[in-house]
Swiss-Prot record:
Protein name, as recorded: Uracil phosphoribosyltransferase
The encoding gene: upp
Record bears the keyword Protein transport: no
Enzyme class, UniProt record, top EC level: transferase
Regulation (activators, inhibitors): Allosterically activated by GTP.
Amino acid sequence: MGKFQVISHPLIQHKLSILRRTSTSTKDFRELVNEIAMLMGYEVLRDLPLEDVEIETPITKTVQKQIAGKKLAIVPILRAGVGMVDGLLSLVPAAKVGHIGMYRDEETLQPVEYLVKLPEDIDQRHIFVVDPMLATGGSAILAVDSLKKRGASNIKFVALVSAPEGVKALQDAHPDIDIYTAALDEKLNEKGYIVPGLGDAGDRLFGTK
């Protein structure tokens, strides 16, 4: 069973509180999503494998640690997931970036996939799927399905705000993946939005309605 972790660092919780506010501007919202993703990255990347490497300091030769293989991929679920990419890339700039495009049918609440663009060697990479919201879990499940169909097996899902229903759905569908979130909220409302949530992350990131 994959692990589920709420990353409750004080800085993350403080920034998340500002992010939720209706009064937060598009500019500030965008910056906060980026900052929170970067802060979460410290914990999300904790389990990366290390290997020994011989280096030379100004004083002597020594054996130190580096990330093994460096085969990482960040895969945002479009469009809102794009807002989290730069925060993680600032920590692992050599990571490749794939894209999975989906939209949610407003009547059925089911995700519809319209784009999959991934590195050719995605099956060899440690993958971090990012989306600010884990609501019903439908988009997350479909994204992981797409990755597994292409041979991927080492997958983590990273969200800013999650609903219990979405977490359970993703765990039931893919019990092997790890899930990280900055907040576990109360529930979904009748329209499938997280309560208290932060509204439509995509609209707030890009200033659309």
